[in-house]
Amino acid sequence: MIEKIWSGESPLWRLLLPLSWLYGLVSGAIRLCYKLKLKRAWRAPVPVVVVGNLTAGGNGKTPVVVWLVEQLQQRGIRVGVVSRGYGGKAESYPLLLSADTTTAQAGDEPVLIYQRTDAPVAVSPVRSDAVKAILAQHPDVQIIVTDDGLQHYRLARDVEIVVIDGVRRFGNGWWLPAGPMRERAGRLKSVDAVIVNGGVPRSGEIPMHLLPGQAVNLRTGTRCDVAQLEHVVAMAGIGHPPRFFATLKMCGVQPEKCVPLADHQSLNHADVSALVSTGQTLVMTEKDAVKCRAFAEENWWYLPVDAQLSGDEPAKLLTQLTSLASGN
């Protein structure tokens, strides 16, 4: 229902307009206060790059963060990552991730990013505290990438990158809750790069596709082509589950059942195992896998995806960030 409201298919969005106007008024006032320096943002001693969204829901932001961190690491840059840690609850903040940190403590995305990149990752509702925690433990870090936080103006940033779902784009264009917007589309004029996940990019936008890898067994780490798996049940607890189901079909998999879950939904063995009958195979997202690995069954697999950016602009962006991190 929410997708129909946000896309404009359902007329119910009109009933929510008063709340959207209030949301837009408050969010605009907050940004204006920082722009006029009525509120002061904290500036880190190293460059900060924000990778965020204008809309609620999954746009492919986390794969972009992983891509960015890995690309900078390959260029010899030492990167730290900070996040709000949605879906997690730590005993105290800031929380610097370690090999023992769970998704219940830090949230799904920070654990995934930590496991994929081995970069220092810290979470805190106050992102500046997370930055300070990283720099205290890893003083050699040259640049900070913040996963989400475009609207977290308390942390000053040097580069802003926005990720857009190229198919859904901005829906009906209204602020939450009548539409999907955290900020209106005009905000794109002030950011440094716009990355479009799928669909048809517009002038000045960087095209991106999510490239699936081999399926990975949660218990053994064994890899195989996902099309080799039989009697598949697909599970996705991400911002936009249909994208994952479409990816499986693109890989030649016709799931016997597709199970969409809420983003950041808590998972346990009983609930997940109940999705699969004898002889079936469960295939989930990598984001779900970080929550399920501790209690996984032998027939549970995940399908990792990597961001693939096209054109000349990604190289220019990486050159800019490398120069920033190097102090040039």
Curated annotation (Swiss-Prot):
Instruction: Enumerate the residues binding ATP.
Output: T55, A56, G57, G58, N59, G60, K61, T62
Sample GO molecular function, one term:
tetraacyldisaccharide 4'-kinase activity
Q: Which InterPro entries match?
A: LpxK (IPR003758), P-loop_NTPase (IPR027417)
Single Gene Ontology BP term?
lipid A biosynthetic process
Cellular-component GO terms for this entry = plasma membrane
Q: Please tell me which top-level EC class this enzyme sits in.
A: transferase
- Cysteine pairs forming cystine bridges in this chain are none
For this UniProt record, the keywords arranged alphabetically read as follows:
ATP-binding, Kinase, Lipid A biosynthesis, Lipid biosynthesis, Lipid metabolism, Nucleotide-binding, Transferase
The protein in question is named Tetraacyldisaccharide 4'-kinase
UniProt source species:
Escherichia coli O139:H28 (strain E24377A / ETEC)
Source organism phylogeny: Bacteria, Pseudomonadati, Pseudomonadota, Gammaproteobacteria, Enterobacterales
